[in-house]
């Protein structure tokens, strides 16, 4: 018999957890179905216990494996969280469940974000394409899309509701995702206490070097990391970025040592698992046991979690890798929604630290905008990996009140036409980054002076 502890709501609102011990937080093991029925020796006792319990909690997989639950109980409402990550076949059993001669569930509320990473599917775009006309008429055009996304796009406004409050990110971190990805929703802070703090760390800390000063004074930081010199390094690892990440972790630990929690304080996101091993190797050199337990994982596995401080190592070394890094990008109106980048940025509560090769990343319009945004907010360092790790760099400080020259002019009609036909489409759709940059340079160099 497991001893129940206060789980936050159990004493006020009893619930039963559907699942098994291996996939359940230890705090909730006593609420698993098999332990909840320990005091029910008879079938009638079980039926009464099930009837009295109003809330049942479980993953879609666990519920699908216990569909006989619906023969015993009827539900008025089912709330499906992270619904944008669940493919339609994983919900069919629950959606069509029956209790006696009626639907087992009266109403469904799906909660999700289609601008973040979708469910993982093994099918290619060609294999997942739907050709049946009846299915396409109901919006089912791609088997890799979730039911949530299909219904969101096809349902009237009366069936949809947007949550405009977010309680995770500090406003200084949330501003770029708001401008770039949530331009319609415009998420606002709740605000919670950490969203009102002036600095990411405890007040009164004294910096011991330039890296400490950087961490104490900047919310968003980009640290350039050049590609490694030697040719034996895998494209899926970047030792320069690994050293930068380890250096940051060492300083973060010193600044937060009194309250450091490996599951809350800091996390590291990378695109490749190969980079995880390289970062672990650099961490081991610090000889700080507490850092061995921090989470270093891919964006896909970080979705749904959060840390006070997030370090994102882009890792990539050549232009061809940009396709992998931006594979989950789609166009909405005139905006490009990079789902993977969106997830990475929005995991951070208090501080976001990025490192990557600006020459490679700058070929992508969204990454370019991100770096320029950080530059304008005094977080972009003009340094290299070795100098950064030594603390041999100067904190940027740009003017925030830009002076505009008196000389202005209107663009001629033929210039606007050429720009709209040649520049805007590649810039928006990212179909040809090289052509976009060359054409821009050509037009800029041949533009007339303001007085012509």
Model-derived segments and spans:
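Conserved motor-coupling elements within RecA-like helicase/translocase cores
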Residues: 31-53, 301-307
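Conserved two-lobed SF2 helicase motor
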Residues: 52-62
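Conserved helicase motor core of SF1/SF2 NTP-dependent helicases
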Residues: 4-13, 47, 61-62, 69, ...
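P-loop NTPase motor core
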Residues: 4-35
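Conserved small/polar residues in nucleotide/adenosyl-binding loops
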Residues: 1-5, 445-452
């Amino acid at each position: 018999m497991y001893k129940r502890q206060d789980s936050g709501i159990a004493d006020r609102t009893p619930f039963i957890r559907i699942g098994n011990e291996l996939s359940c937080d230890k705090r909730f093991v006593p609420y698993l179905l098999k332990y909840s029925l320990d005091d029910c020796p008879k079938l009638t006792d079980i039926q009464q216990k099930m009837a009295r319990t109003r809330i049942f909690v479980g993953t879609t997989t666990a519920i699908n494996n216990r569909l006989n639950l619906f023969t015993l109980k009827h539900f008025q409402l089912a709330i499906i969280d992270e619904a944008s990550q669940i493919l339609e076949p994983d919900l069919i059993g629950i959606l069509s469940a029956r209790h006696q001669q009626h639907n087992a569930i009266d109403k469904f509320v799906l909660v999700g974000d289609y601008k973040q990473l979708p469910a993982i599917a093994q099918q290619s775009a060609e294999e997942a394409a739907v050709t049946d006309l009846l299915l396409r008429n109901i919006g089912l055009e791609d088997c890799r899309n979730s039911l949530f996304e299909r219904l969101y796009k096809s349902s009237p406004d009366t069936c949809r509701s947007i949550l405009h409050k977010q309680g995770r990110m500090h406003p200084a971190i949330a501003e770029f995702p708001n401008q770039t990805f949530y331009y319609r929703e415009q998420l606002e802070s709740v605000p919670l206490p950490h969203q009102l703090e002036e600095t990411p760390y405890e007040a009164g800390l004294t910096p011991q070097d330039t890296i400490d000063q950087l961490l104490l004074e900047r919310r968003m930081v980009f640290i350039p990391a050049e590609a490694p010199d030697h040719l034996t390094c895998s494209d899926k690892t970047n030792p320069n970025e690994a050293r930068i990440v380890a250096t940051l972790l060492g300083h973060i630990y010193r600044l937060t040592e009194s309250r450091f929690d490996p599951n809350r304080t800091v996390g590291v996101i990378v695109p490749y698992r190969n980079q995880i091993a390289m970062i672990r190797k650099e961490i081991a050199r610090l000889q700080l046991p507490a850092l061995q337990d921090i989470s270093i994982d891919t964006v896909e596995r970080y979705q749904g979690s959060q840390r006070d401080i997030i370090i994102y190592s882009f890792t990539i070394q050549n232009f061809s890798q940009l396709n992998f890094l931006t594979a989950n990008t789609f166009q909405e109106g005139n905006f490009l929604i990079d789902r993977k980048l969106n997830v990475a940025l929005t995991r951070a509560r208090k501080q976001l630290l990025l490192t990557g090769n600006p020459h490679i990343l700058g070929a992508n319009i969204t990454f370019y905008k991100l770096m320029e945004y950080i530059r304008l907010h005094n977080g972009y360092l003009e340094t290299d990996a070795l100098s950064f790790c030594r603390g041999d760099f100067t904190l940027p400080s740009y003017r925030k009140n830009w002076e505009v020259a008196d000389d202005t002019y209107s663009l001629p009609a033929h210039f606007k036409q050429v720009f709209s036909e040649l520049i805007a489409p590649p810039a928006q759709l990212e179909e040809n980054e090289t052509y976009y940059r060359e054409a821009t340079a050509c037009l800029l160099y041949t533009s007339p002076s303001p007085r012509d």
